[in-house]
C-alpha cells in the first residue's frame, strides 16, 4: 500500500484520542533543571549562557517597558527550537507543521502588542496606519492598505513557520525515498543522493533554529513599535 507523503503531518492519536498535547508538553520535560547548589554542571551552564545571550540580543532595541516580555519571548524561542529539532527525528510528529498551532501562538501575542500600543500610546499606534507626508487624496487608500497589512501580520507569522518546516520535511522524505529506490538499481547514484540528503538534513536543522528565531524576532519588532 502506498503511503502518502503528507501522512507525517497528521496529528497522532491513540484510541481516537489526539496526542498532540503530549507532543507539545514533551519538550518541557527534556530541559535540565538547575540544581540547588552553587556550582552548576556544564549542560546547565550552556543553557544559561544561551538564554542570557539570546535575551540580551532580543531586548537590546526595546525600552524598559518591553523588557517585561523577556521571559515570555525567551521561553517561546526555546520551545519552538526544541519542537522543531525533535520533529527532525525519524517517525516523530512535528506540532509546528500545524497551522492551527502556529496561529495559536501568533494571534494572541500579536494582539497583545497591539493592545499595549493602543493603551500606552494610542496616537502613535494609530499614526502607524498613515505614513508621514502622504498626499491627501491617497489618505483613505493608504489607511486601508496599512490596516490590512497590520491584520495579516499574525497570518504571515504562522504561515511562514508552517510552510518552511513542511517544505523541509517533504524534501527530506522525497530524497530519502529516492535513495531507497535507486540503491538496488544504481548504487553510485544512490550514494550521491544520500550525500545530498545528509546536506539537506543539516540545512533543515539550521532552518528549524532560524525559523524559531525569526518568529520571536518579528514579535519583538511588533512589540518595539508599541512600547
Swiss-Prot record:
- What InterPro entries has UniProt attached to this entry? ATP_synth_F0_asu, ATP_synth_F0_asu_AS, ATP_synth_F0_asu_bact/mt, F0_ATP_A_sf
UniProt GO MF annotations: proton channel activity; proton-transporting ATP synthase activity, rotational mechanism
The family database entries (Pfam families) matched by this protein are listed as: ATP-synt_A (PF00119)
According to the UniProt record, one GO cellular component term is: mitochondrial inner membrane
- Give the matching PROSITE patterns: ATPASE_A
Example of a GO biological process term: proton motive force-driven ATP synthesis
**Localized where?**
Mitochondrion inner membrane
Query: Mind listing the UniProt keywords for this protein, alphabetically?
Result: ATP synthesis, CF(0), Hydrogen ion transport, Ion transport, Membrane, Mitochondrion, Mitochondrion inner membrane, Transmembrane, Transmembrane helix, Transport
Q: Which reaction does it catalyse?
A: H(+)(in) = H(+)(out)
Transmembrane segments annotated in the record for this chain: 9-29, 69-89, 98-118, 135-157, 179-199, 202-222
Cystine bridges: none
Gene3D superfamilies with a match to the protein in the record: ATP synthase, F0 complex, subunit A
Mode of membrane association: Multi-pass membrane protein
By sequence similarity, the record places it as follows: Belongs to the ATPase A chain family.
User: Whom does it interact with, and what assembly results?
Assistant: Component of the ATP synthase complex composed at least of ATP5F1A/subunit alpha, ATP5F1B/subunit beta, ATP5MC1/subunit c (homooctomer), MT-ATP6/subunit a, MT-ATP8/subunit 8, ATP5ME/subunit e, ATP5MF/subunit f, ATP5MG/subunit g, ATP5MK/subunit k, ATP5MJ/subunit j, ATP5F1C/subunit gamma, ATP5F1D/subunit delta, ATP5F1E/subunit epsilon, ATP5PF/subunit F6, ATP5PB/subunit b, ATP5PD/subunit d, ATP5PO/subunit OSCP.
Q: What does this protein do?
A: Subunit a, of the mitochondrial membrane ATP synthase complex (F(1)F(0) ATP synthase or Complex V) that produces ATP from ADP in the presence of a proton gradient across the membrane which is generated by electron transport complexes of the respiratory chain. ATP synthase complex consist of a soluble F(1) head domain - the catalytic core - and a membrane F(1) domain - the membrane proton channel. These two domains are linked by a central stalk rotating inside the F(1) region and a stationary peripheral stalk.
Name of this chain's protein? ATP synthase F(0) complex subunit a
